[in-house]
Curated annotation (Swiss-Prot):
<feature type="transmembrane region" description="Helical">
    <location>
        <begin position="2"/>
        <end position="22"/>
    </location>
</feature>
<feature type="transmembrane region" description="Helical">
    <location>
        <begin position="146"/>
        <end position="166"/>
    </location>
</feature>
<dbReference type="GO" id="GO:0005743">
    <property type="term" value="C:mitochondrial inner membrane"/>
</dbReference>
<keyword id="KW-0812">Transmembrane</keyword>
<keyword id="KW-0999">Mitochondrion inner membrane</keyword>
<feature type="transmembrane region" description="Helical">
    <location>
        <begin position="222"/>
        <end position="242"/>
    </location>
</feature>
<comment type="subunit">
    <text>Core subunit of respiratory chain NADH dehydrogenase (Complex I) which is composed of 45 different subunits.</text>
</comment>
<dbReference type="InterPro" id="IPR001694">
    <property type="entry name" value="NADH_UbQ_OxRdtase_su1/FPO"/>
</dbReference>
<dbReference type="InterPro" id="IPR018086">
    <property type="entry name" value="NADH_UbQ_OxRdtase_su1_CS"/>
</dbReference>
<keyword id="KW-1133">Transmembrane helix</keyword>
<keyword id="KW-0520">NAD</keyword>
<feature type="transmembrane region" description="Helical">
    <location>
        <begin position="76"/>
        <end position="96"/>
    </location>
</feature>
<dbReference type="GO" id="GO:0032981">
    <property type="term" value="P:mitochondrial respiratory chain complex I assembly"/>
</dbReference>
<dbReference type="Pfam" id="PF00146">
    <property type="entry name" value="NADHdh"/>
</dbReference>
<feature type="transmembrane region" description="Helical">
    <location>
        <begin position="171"/>
        <end position="191"/>
    </location>
</feature>
<keyword id="KW-0496">Mitochondrion</keyword>
<comment type="similarity">
    <text>Belongs to the complex I subunit 1 family.</text>
</comment>
Protein backbone atom coordinates (compact mmCIF):
# COMPACT_ATOMS: atom_id res chain seq x y z
CA UNK A 1 0.00 0.00 0.00
CA UNK A 2 2.74 2.58 0.82
CA UNK A 3 4.30 1.89 -2.61
CA UNK A 4 0.97 2.65 -4.35
CA UNK A 5 0.68 5.89 -2.34
CA UNK A 6 4.23 6.86 -3.30
CA UNK A 7 3.59 6.16 -7.01
CA UNK A 8 0.32 8.13 -6.93
CA UNK A 9 2.08 11.06 -5.26
CA UNK A 10 4.93 11.04 -7.81
CA UNK A 11 2.50 10.79 -10.75
CA UNK A 12 0.37 13.66 -9.41
CA UNK A 13 3.44 15.88 -8.87
CA UNK A 14 4.83 15.13 -12.35
CA UNK A 15 1.47 15.87 -14.04
CA UNK A 16 1.14 19.13 -12.05
CA UNK A 17 4.70 20.06 -13.02
CA UNK A 18 4.03 19.35 -16.72
CA UNK A 19 0.96 21.59 -16.77
CA UNK A 20 2.79 24.29 -14.77
CA UNK A 21 5.27 24.56 -17.65
CA UNK A 22 2.35 24.93 -20.09
CA UNK A 23 0.62 27.49 -17.83
CA UNK A 24 3.82 29.52 -17.64
CA UNK A 25 4.16 29.62 -21.42
CA UNK A 26 0.48 30.59 -21.75
CA UNK A 27 0.77 33.39 -19.14
CA UNK A 28 3.99 34.70 -20.72
CA UNK A 29 2.24 34.59 -24.10
CA UNK A 30 -0.76 36.60 -22.91
CA UNK A 31 1.38 39.19 -21.10
CA UNK A 32 3.34 39.67 -24.34
CA UNK A 33 0.11 39.89 -26.41
CA UNK A 34 0.47 36.53 -28.15
CA UNK A 35 -1.28 33.17 -27.80
CA UNK A 36 1.43 30.84 -26.51
CA UNK A 37 1.40 27.10 -27.37
CA UNK A 38 -1.85 26.28 -29.23
CA UNK A 39 -0.97 23.67 -31.87
CA UNK A 40 -0.58 20.31 -30.07
CA UNK A 41 -4.01 19.13 -28.91
CA UNK A 42 -7.00 21.37 -28.05
CA UNK A 43 -5.75 24.81 -26.90
CA UNK A 44 -2.20 23.38 -26.77
CA UNK A 45 -3.04 21.15 -23.77
CA UNK A 46 -0.88 18.26 -25.01
CA UNK A 47 2.21 20.45 -25.48
CA UNK A 48 4.01 19.22 -22.28
CA UNK A 49 3.66 15.58 -23.40
CA UNK A 50 4.94 16.43 -26.89
CA UNK A 51 7.94 18.21 -25.33
CA UNK A 52 8.63 15.23 -23.03
CA UNK A 53 8.41 12.78 -25.95
CA UNK A 54 10.77 14.91 -28.04
CA UNK A 55 13.37 15.40 -25.27
CA UNK A 56 13.43 11.83 -23.96
CA UNK A 57 13.69 10.25 -27.43
CA UNK A 58 16.63 12.44 -28.51
CA UNK A 59 20.20 11.22 -28.14
CA UNK A 60 21.74 12.60 -24.90
CA UNK A 61 24.95 14.18 -26.17
CA UNK A 62 27.87 14.34 -23.72
CA UNK A 63 30.82 16.73 -24.07
CA UNK A 64 33.99 14.74 -24.77
CA UNK A 65 35.89 16.53 -21.98
CA UNK A 66 33.17 16.15 -19.32
CA UNK A 67 33.32 13.96 -16.19
CA UNK A 68 30.69 11.47 -17.34
CA UNK A 69 29.61 9.99 -13.96
CA UNK A 70 28.85 13.32 -12.26
CA UNK A 71 27.48 14.72 -15.52
CA UNK A 72 24.79 12.00 -15.61
CA UNK A 73 24.14 11.76 -11.83
CA UNK A 74 23.53 15.53 -11.32
CA UNK A 75 20.16 15.92 -13.13
CA UNK A 76 18.86 12.63 -11.67
CA UNK A 77 19.87 13.78 -8.16
CA UNK A 78 18.13 17.15 -8.66
CA UNK A 79 14.79 15.52 -9.54
CA UNK A 80 15.11 12.83 -6.84
CA UNK A 81 15.61 15.47 -4.12
CA UNK A 82 12.72 17.57 -5.51
CA UNK A 83 10.38 14.54 -5.25
CA UNK A 84 11.77 13.40 -1.87
CA UNK A 85 10.86 16.75 -0.28
CA UNK A 86 7.13 16.01 -0.75
CA UNK A 87 7.09 12.95 1.54
CA UNK A 88 6.59 14.71 4.94
CA UNK A 89 3.96 17.21 3.67
CA UNK A 90 0.52 16.60 5.29
CA UNK A 91 -2.11 16.75 2.51
CA UNK A 92 -3.85 16.13 4.99
CA UNK A 93 -2.09 12.81 5.79
CA UNK A 94 1.68 12.77 5.13
CA UNK A 95 3.34 9.88 3.30
CA UNK A 96 5.93 9.71 6.12
CA UNK A 97 5.01 11.37 9.42
CA UNK A 98 8.26 12.92 10.62
CA UNK A 99 8.57 14.71 13.97
CA UNK A 100 11.24 16.94 12.42
CA UNK A 101 9.45 17.39 9.08
CA UNK A 102 10.41 21.04 8.59
CA UNK A 103 14.03 20.37 9.50
CA UNK A 104 14.10 17.47 7.01
CA UNK A 105 12.78 19.71 4.21
CA UNK A 106 15.32 22.43 5.03
CA UNK A 107 18.21 19.94 5.15
CA UNK A 108 17.20 17.99 2.03
CA UNK A 109 16.55 21.12 -0.05
CA UNK A 110 20.10 22.31 0.66
CA UNK A 111 21.38 19.14 -1.06
CA UNK A 112 20.13 20.57 -4.38
CA UNK A 113 23.25 22.76 -4.27
CA UNK A 114 25.38 19.65 -4.90
CA UNK A 115 23.53 18.71 -8.09
CA UNK A 116 23.96 22.26 -9.44
CA UNK A 117 27.66 22.44 -8.51
CA UNK A 118 28.40 18.97 -9.89
CA UNK A 119 26.62 19.70 -13.17
CA UNK A 120 28.56 22.95 -13.67
CA UNK A 121 31.91 21.40 -12.78
CA UNK A 122 31.39 18.10 -14.64
CA UNK A 123 30.40 19.89 -17.88
CA UNK A 124 33.96 21.28 -18.12
CA UNK A 125 32.62 24.55 -19.52
CA UNK A 126 33.37 28.04 -18.21
CA UNK A 127 29.80 29.22 -18.80
CA UNK A 128 28.34 26.26 -16.89
CA UNK A 129 30.84 26.59 -14.02
CA UNK A 130 30.22 30.34 -13.52
CA UNK A 131 26.45 29.72 -13.67
CA UNK A 132 26.78 26.93 -11.10
CA UNK A 133 28.90 29.08 -8.74
CA UNK A 134 26.34 31.88 -8.98
CA UNK A 135 23.50 29.46 -8.26
CA UNK A 136 25.29 27.93 -5.27
CA UNK A 137 26.17 31.34 -3.73
CA UNK A 138 22.58 32.51 -4.20
CA UNK A 139 20.96 29.33 -2.84
CA UNK A 140 23.22 29.10 0.23
CA UNK A 141 22.70 32.81 1.00
CA UNK A 142 18.91 32.72 0.86
CA UNK A 143 18.74 29.47 2.85
CA UNK A 144 19.98 31.45 5.86
CA UNK A 145 16.93 33.71 5.67
CA UNK A 146 14.58 30.76 5.12
CA UNK A 147 16.00 28.98 8.20
CA UNK A 148 15.64 32.07 10.42
CA UNK A 149 12.06 32.69 9.24
CA UNK A 150 11.22 29.03 9.91
CA UNK A 151 12.66 29.31 13.44
CA UNK A 152 10.48 32.36 14.11
CA UNK A 153 7.38 30.48 12.90
CA UNK A 154 8.31 27.37 14.91
CA UNK A 155 8.45 29.48 18.07
CA UNK A 156 4.77 30.25 17.43
CA UNK A 157 3.72 26.67 16.56
CA UNK A 158 6.00 24.99 19.12
CA UNK A 159 6.94 21.97 16.98
CA UNK A 160 8.98 20.95 13.93
CA UNK A 161 6.09 18.70 12.90
CA UNK A 162 4.21 20.10 9.90
CA UNK A 163 0.89 18.78 11.24
CA UNK A 164 1.31 21.09 14.28
CA UNK A 165 1.07 24.08 11.92
CA UNK A 166 -2.47 22.98 10.96
CA UNK A 167 -3.49 23.00 14.66
CA UNK A 168 -1.75 26.35 15.28
CA UNK A 169 -3.71 28.02 12.46
CA UNK A 170 -7.17 26.71 13.36
CA UNK A 171 -8.43 30.20 14.28
CA UNK A 172 -6.28 32.53 12.17
CA UNK A 173 -3.50 32.32 9.60
CA UNK A 174 0.07 32.96 10.76
CA UNK A 175 0.22 35.39 7.84
CA UNK A 176 -1.70 37.99 9.90
CA UNK A 177 0.63 38.33 12.94
CA UNK A 178 3.82 37.70 10.94
CA UNK A 179 3.25 39.32 7.53
CA UNK A 180 6.81 40.80 7.32
CA UNK A 181 8.18 37.27 7.72
CA UNK A 182 5.74 35.96 5.09
CA UNK A 183 6.81 38.65 2.62
CA UNK A 184 10.52 37.93 3.14
CA UNK A 185 9.83 34.18 2.97
CA UNK A 186 8.04 34.54 -0.38
CA UNK A 187 10.85 36.64 -1.90
CA UNK A 188 13.43 34.19 -0.52
CA UNK A 189 11.59 31.23 -2.11
CA UNK A 190 11.79 33.07 -5.45
CA UNK A 191 15.56 33.35 -5.01
CA UNK A 192 15.88 29.78 -3.67
CA UNK A 193 14.22 28.32 -6.79
CA UNK A 194 16.30 30.57 -9.11
CA UNK A 195 13.21 32.27 -10.51
CA UNK A 196 12.87 35.75 -12.03
CA UNK A 197 13.78 38.40 -10.96
CA UNK A 198 16.52 36.32 -9.24
CA UNK A 199 17.39 34.06 -12.21
CA UNK A 200 21.00 35.27 -12.33
CA UNK A 201 22.19 31.71 -13.02
CA UNK A 202 20.58 31.85 -16.47
CA UNK A 203 21.82 35.28 -17.54
CA UNK A 204 21.43 34.54 -21.28
CA UNK A 205 23.46 37.56 -22.38
CA UNK A 206 26.40 36.53 -20.15
CA UNK A 207 26.23 32.78 -19.51
CA UNK A 208 24.25 31.30 -22.46
CA UNK A 209 22.02 29.18 -20.17
CA UNK A 210 23.83 28.84 -16.85
CA UNK A 211 24.82 25.55 -15.25
CA UNK A 212 22.82 23.46 -17.77
CA UNK A 213 24.48 24.95 -20.88
CA UNK A 214 26.12 21.66 -21.94
CA UNK A 215 23.05 19.50 -21.30
CA UNK A 216 20.69 18.19 -23.98
CA UNK A 217 17.73 15.81 -24.36
CA UNK A 218 16.72 13.78 -21.23
CA UNK A 219 19.19 15.16 -18.64
CA UNK A 220 18.28 18.72 -19.71
CA UNK A 221 14.59 17.89 -19.19
CA UNK A 222 15.31 16.46 -15.72
CA UNK A 223 16.76 19.81 -14.58
CA UNK A 224 13.66 21.63 -15.75
CA UNK A 225 11.40 19.07 -14.09
CA UNK A 226 13.31 19.51 -10.81
CA UNK A 227 13.01 23.32 -11.03
CA UNK A 228 9.25 23.32 -11.56
CA UNK A 229 8.68 20.60 -8.94
CA UNK A 230 10.60 22.79 -6.46
CA UNK A 231 8.42 25.78 -7.35
CA UNK A 232 5.23 23.87 -6.52
CA UNK A 233 6.83 22.49 -3.34
CA UNK A 234 7.93 25.92 -2.09
CA UNK A 235 4.44 27.32 -2.65
CA UNK A 236 2.89 24.30 -0.90
CA UNK A 237 5.22 24.99 2.03
CA UNK A 238 4.27 28.69 2.05
CA UNK A 239 0.59 27.68 2.11
CA UNK A 240 1.22 25.29 5.00
CA UNK A 241 3.26 27.74 7.08
CA UNK A 242 1.40 31.03 6.56
CA UNK A 243 -1.99 30.18 5.00
CA UNK A 244 -2.86 27.10 7.05
CA UNK A 245 -6.09 25.29 6.16
CA UNK A 246 -8.31 23.98 8.96
CA UNK A 247 -8.53 20.19 8.86
CA UNK A 248 -12.03 18.77 9.40
CA UNK A 249 -11.76 15.04 10.18
CA UNK A 250 -15.17 14.40 8.55
CA UNK A 251 -14.21 15.98 5.20
CA UNK A 252 -10.47 15.58 4.50
CA UNK A 253 -11.18 16.27 0.79
CA UNK A 254 -12.05 19.88 1.68
CA UNK A 255 -8.59 20.39 3.23
CA UNK A 256 -6.87 19.00 0.13
CA UNK A 257 -9.01 21.14 -2.21
CA UNK A 258 -8.37 24.40 -0.30
CA UNK A 259 -4.67 23.56 0.08
CA UNK A 260 -4.37 22.96 -3.68
CA UNK A 261 -6.21 26.19 -4.59
CA UNK A 262 -3.94 28.30 -2.34
CA UNK A 263 -0.82 26.61 -3.74
CA UNK A 264 -2.02 27.21 -7.32
CA UNK A 265 -2.68 30.90 -6.61
CA UNK A 266 0.82 31.37 -5.14
CA UNK A 267 2.36 29.50 -8.10
CA UNK A 268 0.45 31.78 -10.50
CA UNK A 269 1.97 34.73 -8.63
CA UNK A 270 5.45 33.25 -9.31
CA UNK A 271 4.65 33.16 -13.03
CA UNK A 272 3.13 36.66 -12.98
CA UNK A 273 6.29 38.03 -11.31
CA UNK A 274 8.42 36.39 -14.02
CA UNK A 275 6.43 38.07 -16.79
CA UNK A 276 6.52 41.48 -15.07
CA UNK A 277 9.88 42.19 -13.43
CA UNK A 278 13.33 42.52 -15.03
CA UNK A 279 16.35 40.64 -13.66
CA UNK A 280 18.32 42.00 -10.67
CA UNK A 281 22.01 42.77 -10.84
CA UNK A 282 24.10 40.28 -8.88
CA UNK A 283 25.26 42.86 -6.31
CA UNK A 284 21.64 43.97 -5.73
CA UNK A 285 20.66 40.34 -5.19
CA UNK A 286 23.30 39.87 -2.48
CA UNK A 287 22.75 43.28 -0.86
CA UNK A 288 19.02 42.53 -0.55
CA UNK A 289 19.82 39.49 1.55
CA UNK A 290 22.89 40.43 3.59
CA UNK A 291 22.02 44.10 4.22
CA UNK A 292 18.20 43.96 4.43
CA UNK A 293 16.70 40.52 5.00
CA UNK A 294 19.29 39.12 7.41
CA UNK A 295 19.19 42.00 9.96
CA UNK A 296 15.37 42.11 9.74
CA UNK A 297 14.90 38.37 10.24
CA UNK A 298 17.38 38.35 13.15
CA UNK A 299 15.52 41.23 14.81
CA UNK A 300 12.15 39.50 14.33
CA UNK A 301 13.58 36.21 15.63
CA UNK A 302 14.78 37.99 18.80
CA UNK A 303 11.30 39.52 19.12
CA UNK A 304 9.61 36.11 18.84
CA UNK A 305 11.98 34.71 21.47
CA UNK A 306 11.69 37.62 23.93
CA UNK A 307 7.88 38.16 23.89
CA UNK A 308 6.96 34.69 25.30
CA UNK A 309 9.71 35.01 27.95
CA UNK A 310 8.58 38.52 28.94
CA UNK A 311 4.90 37.51 29.18
CA UNK A 312 5.38 34.07 30.78
CA UNK A 313 4.51 35.40 34.25
CA UNK A 314 1.10 36.75 33.16
CA UNK A 315 -1.77 34.36 34.09
CA UNK A 316 -4.10 33.12 31.28
CA UNK A 317 -6.65 35.80 30.31
CA UNK A 318 -9.83 33.71 29.95
Amino acid sequence: MPMINLLLLIMSILIAMAFLMLTERKILGHTQLRKGPNIVGPYGLLQPFADALKLFTKEPLKPSTSTITLYIISPALALTIALLLWTPLPMPIPLINLNLGLLFILAASSLTVYSILWSGWASNSNYALIGALRAVAQTISYEITLALILLSVLLMSGSFNLSALITTQEHSWLLLPSWPLALMWFISTLAETNRAPFDLTEGESELVSGFNTEYAAGPFALFFMAEYTNIILMNALTTMIFLGTTFNIHSPELYTTLFTIKTLLLTSLFLWIRSTYPRFRYDQLMHLLWKNFLPLTLALLMWHISVPIATSGIPPQT
